[in-house]
Design a protein with these regions (language model features):
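N-terminal activation segment of mature serine protease catalytic domains
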Residues: 29-125, 290-293
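Active-site substrate-binding loop(s) of clan PA
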Residues: 92-94, 125, 160-163, 175-206
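Active-site region of chymotrypsin-like
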Residues: 99-115, 156, 172-183, 208-293
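Short, surface-exposed secondary-structure boundary micro-motifs
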Residues: 135-137, 201, 258
Length: 293
């Protein structure tokens, strides 16, 4: 069992990496933005432009001295605050239409190869105009300097505070300035075999939609405690942490969290013959509990 933390590991361990932040490289990015072709044609995602623009905006804000430090955010995270939210009643939208409320959540840092700021992107989504949900382990990255959020429309904000968190649930709710964006709708527990869609940012493939079914619910160990989790068959990888899992009516029923690789053999600590990859999510019931719903 592992989260993807953006660290280098052996090839045989790839699928059991931590599902947190995918590190942006040191090369410069050309300017650009998400381009919509209009009409019924889909928006065309420019991955290089997204990470480049987010990095430039984060750099500007870091150099201005405005952002809350990651040290302060982690201090808030460790206190595991709770918040009581009264979410407005709303209907879900098709997963592809909900992308306006899906965010890139990225740790901002300086690497050892240059003096520039970089962004290591993971996933998240709006549950209120000023609140973003992601995983606890996405925030718990002390090697980062601060945390930035980019919306689908290109706006970039620095995280102001952690308003709710649970290591056991692997969830964090972050406050950003009000966005004016309609948040996602939360659903109820999806039954086993239910169809689901996931939108996330695996390894900087931004706004990737994958589909599958709820495979099972099970008990797993997290923060030295037993907690229920949901497995799905929709694919995801590093950078997908915090991505919303939608049911067929466009309501969020889970949050992507981790992968677990099943190997047939293990010898001298080396795993071989990968057989299956399990994809684990946080059930929406735990998010509802965290925000007092």
């Amino acid at each position: 069992m592992a989260y993807i933390a953006g660290v280098k590991m052996d090839l045989a361990q790839w699928c059991s990496l931590f599902l947190a932040l995918g590190v942006a490289g040191c090369t410069s990015m050309k300017p650009g933005a998400v381009r919509s072709t209009g009409g019924t044609k889909p928006a065309v995602i420019n991955d290089r432009a997204i990470i480049g623009q987010m990095t430039r905006e984060a750099t500007r804000m870091m150099d201005s001295g405005e952002p809350v430090s990651m040290e302060s955010l982690i201090e808030q995270l460790k206190k595991e605050p709770r918040v009581s939210l009264k979410l407005p009643a709303g209907k879900g939208a098709p997963a592809a239409d909900a992308q306006k409320a899906i965010a890139v959540v990225g740790g901002v840092y300086k690497c050892k190869s240059c003096t520039r700021w970089h962004v290591a992107p993971a996933s998240g989504f709006l549950i209120a105009e000023d609140m973003v949900v992601t995983n606890y382990h996405v925030v718990n990255q002390p090697e980062r300097s601060s945390l930035a959020v980019r919306l689908f429309d290109g706006r970039v904000f620095m995280v102001e505070a952690v308003v709710a968190a649970s290591e056991r649930f692997d969830l964090a709710v972050l406050r950003i300035p009000k966005t004016g964006v309609k948040p996602v709708a939360l659903g109820q527990a999806a039954p086993v075999e239910a169809k689901v869609d996931l939108i996330s940012h695996p390894n900087q493939r931004f706004y990737t939609l994958t589909e599958g079914r709820v495979a099972r619910y099970f008990m797993m160990q997290r923060d030295r405690k037993q907690v229920s989790a949901m497995s799905i068959t929709a694919d995801f990888g590093r950078g997908s942490s915090g991505g919303p899992v939608f049911n067929e009516t466009g309501e969020v029923v889970g949050i992507a969290a981790s992968t677990e690789s099943l190997y047939y053999t293990e010898k001298d600590g080396e795993q071989k013959n990968l057989q299956m990859l399990f994809k684990h999510c946080v059930p929406v019931s735990q998010l509802r509990e965290l925000i007092g719903e």
